[in-house]
UniProtKB/Swiss-Prot annotation:
Protein encoded by which gene: PNO1
Region annotated Disordered, chain positions: 1-39, 51-92
GO terms for MF: rRNA primary transcript binding; unfolded protein binding
SUPFAM superfamilies per the UniProt record, alphabetical: Eukaryotic type KH-domain (KH-domain type I)
Gene3D superfamilies, per the entry: K Homology domain, type 1 (3.30.1370.10)
Protein name, entry field: Pre-rRNA-processing protein PNO1
Subcellular location: Cytoplasm; Nucleus, Nucleolus
UniProt cross-references to Pfam families, sorted A to Z: KH_KRR1_1st, KH_PNO1_2nd
Family per record: Belongs to the PNO1 family.
UniProt keyword Methyltransferase present: no
Length: 276
């Protein structure tokens, strides 16, 4: 009876071993399947195209648009080979709301009232500023508004009013609004030479001349405008023109005879004609 029982034990052991092997093979196959699935998933995610057919259809017109835009925005050159660019639009530019007060001396209030009808139209129509004359504070008030387009309009308007308060004529002061390269230079006689009493009066007389002939000669030769306000001298004009007029006035203050100054003005006038 011992042999049959021994055989049964061996068969039972072999069956158990087979079940263990089958379980291990199943587990290994499942692990391989999972790895294969993971690999398939990785391959699939990389293989999926990022753009669909609809996206491609939508992207094609955009490419054509960019090409068309590139064709329309070609660089244009002028005759000398320099690139030509279109002017920047002023619609996006905004001017800050600012105000400025220009003080008026007491002796210029009456002339300001008399020619006020000539002063405010260029400020309002040309520079698009708001202007008023304050009689209580004796100032001219300027202010920008939503219709102002020029950034430097307030400064130009203040220079125009300031030129009139210094003694320049309205027609001469309006040139400050039309031209950008005009300036006003002010200096005193004592800055050149310390003079008092009759010596100061004679220096002012030499600058003006008889009936203002010397002053007019300097203005016509140098294309400037000169105002003699007591011991102060105001010159309106371009940078180089102001320098020429200042040299003539300084030479008169230092005592040069008017005849010599006239000779120098003739040479200056001839040079000006050659330049322009």
């Amino acid at each position: 009876m011992a042999a049959p029982t021994a055989i049964r034990k061996s068969t039972e052991k072999s069956g158990i071993n087979e079940q263990i092997q089958e379980n291990s093979t199943l587990q290994s196959n499942q692990a391989l399947d999972q790895n294969n699935d993971d690999e398939d998933m990785l391959i699939d995610t990389n293989a999926i195209p990022t753009t669909t057919v609809e996206d491609q259809d939508q992207s094609e017109p955009s490419n054509s648009l960019t090409i068309q835009q590139g064709e329309t925005t070609e660089l244009q050159l002028d005759e000398s080979g320099k690139p030509k660019f279109s002017a920047a639009s002023k619609s996006n530019m905004k001017v800050k709301l600012e105000s400025r007060k220009v003080a008026v001396p007491p002796h210029r209030m009456t002339p300001l009232k008399n020619v006020w009808s000539k002063i405010y139209p260029p400020l309002v129509e040309h520079l698009k500023l708001q202007v008023r004359m304050n009689l209580k504070t004796k100032t001219v008030e300027l202010r920008t508004n939503k219709y102002t387009t020029d950034v430097g309009a307030l400064q130009k308007g203040a220079d125009f009013v300031k030129a009139f308060t210094l003694g320049f004529d309205v027609d001469d002061a309006i040139a400050l609004l039309r031209l950008d390269d005009l300036y006003i230079e002010t200096f005193e006689i004592k800055d050149v030479k310390t003079l008092t009493g009759d010596h100061l009066s004679r220096a002012i007389g030499r600058i003006a001349g008889k009936d203002g002939k010397t002053k007019f000669a300097i203005e016509n030769a140098t294309r400037t405008r000169i105002v003699l306000a007591d011991s102060k001298i105001h010159i309106l004009g371009g940078f180089t023109h102001i320098r020429m007029a200042r040299e003539a006035v300084v030479s008169l203050i230092l005592g040069s005879p008017p005849g010599k100054v006239y000779g120098n003005l003739r040479t200056v006038a001839s040079r000006m004609k050659e330049r322009y």
